[in-house]
Amino acid sequence: VTRAPAVRRRRRRWPCAAALTVLGLIAAMVLTRDSSKFEYRDAADTAAHRLDTGPLVPSALDVQWWVRDHPGDARAAAIRDRIARHPIAMWATGNDEDDSRNIGDIVTRARDAGGTAQLVLYNIPDRDDGFSGPHHAVTPRVYRAWVDRVSALVGDARLVLIVEPDALWFADRQSLEGTDFGDRIDSLRYVVETFSARNANTRVYVDAGTSSGSVTPERMAALLAKVGVSDRVGYAVNVSSFAPTAEITAYAQRIRAALQQWFGIPDPRYVVDTSQNGNPDWNFDWCNPAGRILGTPPAVLGHHDGLDMNLWILAPGSSNGPCGAAPDAPGGQFSPALATALLR
């Protein structure tokens, strides 16, 4: 399974401006009470807005493979029982051969299990914005063609899609409202529109960063509205990050309130990456910080307050880069030492 590339993902602080627009939108949404699944219903077009997840299907196998290949390692049993048995998302990073094989595999396993796969798109032009070296050399045209291929591979399979971690988080650094900013917004909107039009059983969540203060919730809501977040397209918070549940919930709820009040979206939905947020506090250290612990296991919730799912979007034990508690582990590489540290 493709791993996230060896990049250092950084959550910086900088001043932000809020863009306020009021749109009119009326819809109706009903959630089932079965905790294993949820359905979205829109009064205008029920079939187009329904997603019955069934079980979440493991989509990233790095951890399972490590356990399989290290039967004599004293850490293997604990990693197997407390991490590997949970469904974890797969990351697609632009390697066409790996992406085709891996996406085909998770789609097949989801269909066979009657469940839902989890996929992260992480291939946006200028990914990581050069913080870890040269900018990601993908043009908007090449990116759109890649999105088309991924959409075709997914087809009618049931999928939770997380769209481009950090892309909106760094958008304002690309000369506010300038050409690069516009390209990024257009690329993300293309993902949203493509999967909304072609993949009826895919639920899309655009990454909305975390609660470190680098981007205000109100500014993030404005950015999410620009790329097409609506009642049928949600947002994801805390991806690959460590904000505790209370803190990240407050951040997500402020985004939700802004989307409702300023952009006329009656019931914005979101998911939370809880893979590494079991601590009650966080000092905003983003790169393999010591002392972190596992968070709440993945679960489909469908709460009335907008929370659809707790997910493990980054595999617990995956390195953020060669730093912190894993100075020798490249970004995206599974580190049994990091994984074991999370099991305290």
Locate the predicted segments by residue.
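Hydrophobic faces of well-ordered beta-strands that scaffold small-molecule active sites
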Residues: 53-61, 89-90, 115-119, 159-163, ...
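Substrate-binding cleft of extracellular glycoside hydrolase catalytic domains
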Residues: 97, 105-204, 218-219, 223, ...
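N-terminal carbohydrate-binding/catalytic regions of secreted carbohydrate-active enzymes
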Residues: 51-153, 315-319, 325-329, 333-334, ...
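Actinobacteria-biased recognition of intrinsically disordered, low-complexity terminal regions
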Residues: 1-10, 44-49
